[in-house]
Amino acid sequence: MFVQRLSAAPWTMIAAIDAGALRERAFRETAGRLVILLALIAGAFVFIEYYSRYPSIIEFRFAPPFNRLRFYAVFLTVLLLTVHRAGEALDTPVADLFSAFGRLLSGLLDFPYSPVRLVLLALPEGTPPAMMAEVRDAASIAYLVALGLLLCFAWLVKIKGWPGRQGAFNVWLNLPLFDPTGGGDVLARLKRDSSINIVLGFLLPFLTPAAFKLVVLVIGPVSITSPQTLIWVMTAWAIVPANLGMRGIALHR
């Protein structure tokens, strides 16, 4: 049990570090050092949270592999985007394969009114075509990982009967922020929260580019041309809604 709890922290740190680790310049810059510091803090928090006997913030601690899937999705997204973005610098067959994979996905997922197309429409006018291609490929890769995450979890719930095989589901341990004494029927509140999370998980990939466009109109141009900025923005844009969708499915279950 101790080893299982200990193993959660390194994945958090690795997912946050690898975007800079594959690019040596990041370690010589302030942003790179800040990412490492935040990764260490996040890893320490996850370790303390999982090792403690009583829950505080993290949900579904004792309903694996819910959180494990989320960590793996973030790690995989950051890794794929990093290798794809650094393809020319790495100049390896693996990097070339990821670059070709990104171009293939962009052709499949970039269609009218798709989230990927809306991301492109949110870019400032005059964005170079090469940069637009990079953003399109990154958005396609991140969105595919998010869809895969949702499908994988839905399969676990529908086919494997999650979380039934993990024993009795303790609401207090797995939903520490949910107050069953808050008033009203508990099942009705869980279904309401489930519906809200699923709707937000579906809509956010469409609404976020529009919100970004409004922010640009208010505060001026915002550049995402930096490799690390592009990687983390695309990761958050895709994985955060997927996490909300997962939470909605879990609450409905």
Language-model regions, residue ranges each:
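Alpha-helical transmembrane segments and their helix-start/interface "positive-inside/aromatic belt" motifs
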Residues: 1, 60-77, 139-148, 188-198
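Loop-to-transmembrane boundary segments
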Residues: 1-9, 182-205
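N-terminal ordered "arm"
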Residues: 1-59
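Juxtamembrane "helix exit" motif at the C-terminal ends of alpha-helical transmembrane segments
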Residues: 23-25, 204-225
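Alpha-helical transmembrane segments
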Residues: 30-39, 137-158, 230-239
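Long, highly hydrophobic alpha-helical transmembrane signal-anchor segments
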Residues: 55, 64, 68-69, 86-150, ...
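Juxtamembrane inter-helical linkers in multi-pass membrane proteins
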Residues: 162-185
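Alpha-helical transmembrane segments and their immediate juxtamembrane interface regions
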Residues: 216-253
